[in-house]
């Protein structure tokens, strides 16, 4: 699996070959540093750990400082592991090597975007699951417009089944959006523009895979 770590900058609009407007997300990706290389002999599988976004040394715990010193790099805020990275890239990866955006992606191909969705706090079933509420707004209905309705049967089975959609904490979850096209790639500025929206707020971390 090939990928890179980046940040969401915002959204814009581009036009495709047919002249249709396409809502797009602007992402800054990399450069990332190889902070660890895993192999079958020692770890049981092959993978590459990439680090992104510099962090102050005084805010880094000593075990992690040793981890970064082995790679001869500055502390990083975000660490992500990609399996079979070197094999798919087609060349040997070295510890401390810098991975650029144009090393992984080309304009026109499709990628997957992973991010942390915006947290909404405790929400009801209408906002959380798209419920329509109970009944109409006449005929004596009272405070039922956004109610969940029945959540189970009576004496049989005498319980509420797992997975019942109810009110609760909404958002703040890892979300993956697949098959987003790279509309534009600006390698000198480490920026790419992909079609559609990606999860998370501005300046949130985004993992791009292909």
UniProtKB/Swiss-Prot annotation:
Q: Give a GO molecular function annotation for the protein.
A: structural constituent of ribosome
Statement: the UniProt record of this protein carries the keyword Kinase: no
Key words, A-Z: Ribonucleoprotein, Ribosomal protein, RNA-binding, rRNA-binding
Gene Ontology CC annotation, any one: cytosolic large ribosomal subunit
| A single BP term in Gene Ontology | translation
Any single Pfam family the record assigns to this protein: Ribosomal_L3
Keyword Ribonucleoprotein recorded: yes
Its family remark reads: Belongs to the universal ribosomal protein uL3 family.
**Assembly behavior:** Part of the 50S ribosomal subunit. Forms a cluster with proteins L14 and L19.
Provide the function of this protein.
Answer: One of the primary rRNA binding proteins, it binds directly near the 3'-end of the 23S rRNA, where it nucleates assembly of the 50S subunit.
What is the protein's given name?
Large ribosomal subunit protein uL3
Gene name as annotated:
rplC
């Amino acid at each position: 699996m090939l990928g890179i770590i980046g940040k969401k900058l915002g959204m814009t609009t581009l036009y495709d070959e047919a002249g249709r407007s396409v809502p797009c997300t602007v992402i800054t990706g990399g450069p990332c540093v190889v902070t660890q290389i895993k192999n079958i002999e020692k770890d049981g599988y092959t993978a590459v750990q990439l680090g992104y976004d510099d962090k102050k040394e005084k805010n880094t715990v000593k075990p992690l400082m040793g981890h970064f010193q082995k790679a001869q790099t500055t502390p990083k805020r975000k660490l992500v592991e990609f399996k079979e990275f070197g094999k798919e890239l087609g060349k040997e990866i070295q510890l401390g090597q810098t991975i650029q955006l144009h090393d992984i992606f080309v304009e026109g191909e499709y990628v997957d975007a992973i991010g942390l969705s915006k947290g909404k706090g405790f929400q009801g079933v209408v906002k959380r699951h798209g419920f329509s509420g109970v009944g109409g707004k006449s005929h004596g209905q009272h405070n039922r417009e956004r109610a969940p309705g029945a959540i189970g049967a009576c004496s049989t089975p005498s319980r509420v089944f797992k997975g019942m959609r109810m009110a609760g904490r909404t958002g703040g979850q890892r979300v993956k959006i697949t098959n987003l096209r790279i509309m534009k790639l600006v390698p000198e500025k480490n920026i790419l523009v992909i079609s559609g929206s990606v999860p998370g707020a501005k300046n949130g971390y985004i993992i791009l895979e292909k």
